[in-house]
């Protein structure tokens, strides 16, 4: 799925907060990566973040 830059920022930010609060990391990351935002970005790039985006279509009358 193609995400807008706003959706991408929201997904990475939400996942980074989860990681910072102690949520388990889903994929193996390099030992030198400790920043939650960097970890969330790696997860996003590998399409493993467990967050779903629900888009609502606008219906014009």
Curated annotation (Swiss-Prot):
Protein name: DNA-directed RNA polymerase subunit Rpo6
InterPro entries: DNA-dir_RNA_polK_14-18kDa_CS (IPR020708), Pol_omega/Rpo6/RPB6 (IPR006110), RPB6/omega-like_sf (IPR036161), Rpo6/Rpb6 (IPR006111)
Gene assigned in the entry: rpo6
Function, as annotated: DNA-dependent RNA polymerase (RNAP) catalyzes the transcription of DNA into RNA using the four ribonucleoside triphosphates as substrates.
Enzyme Commission code(s) on record: 2.7.7.6
Keyword Ribosomal protein on entry: no
Pfam family of the protein (one): RNA_pol_Rpb6
GO molecular function, one term: DNA-directed RNA polymerase activity
Major localization class: cytoplasm
Family designation: Belongs to the archaeal Rpo6/eukaryotic RPB6 RNA polymerase subunit family.
GO cellular component terms, A-Z: cytoplasm; DNA-directed RNA polymerase complex
Gene Ontology BP term (one): tRNA transcription by RNA polymerase III
Taxonomic source organism: Thermoplasma volcanium (strain ATCC 51530 / DSM 4299 / JCM 9571 / NBRC 15438 / GSS1)
Enzymatic class: transferase
Keywords: Cytoplasm, DNA-directed RNA polymerase, Nucleotidyltransferase, Transcription, Transferase
Catalysed reactions, semicolon-separated: RNA(n) + a ribonucleoside 5'-triphosphate = RNA(n+1) + diphosphate
Cited PANTHER family: DNA-DIRECTED RNA POLYMERASE SUBUNIT K, DNA-DIRECTED RNA POLYMERASES I, II, AND III SUBUNIT RPABC2
Subcellular location field: Cytoplasm
Subunit structure: Part of the RNA polymerase complex.
Top-level taxon of origin: Archaea
Record's signal peptide: none
């Amino acid at each position: 799925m193609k995400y807008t830059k706003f959706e991408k920022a929201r997904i990475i930010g939400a996942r980074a907060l989860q990681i910072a609060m102690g949520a388990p990391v889903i994929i193996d990351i390099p030992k030198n990566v400790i920043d939650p935002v960097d970890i969330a970005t790696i997860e996003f790039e590998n399409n493993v973040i467990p967050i779903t985006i629900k888009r609502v279509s606008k219906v014009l009358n």
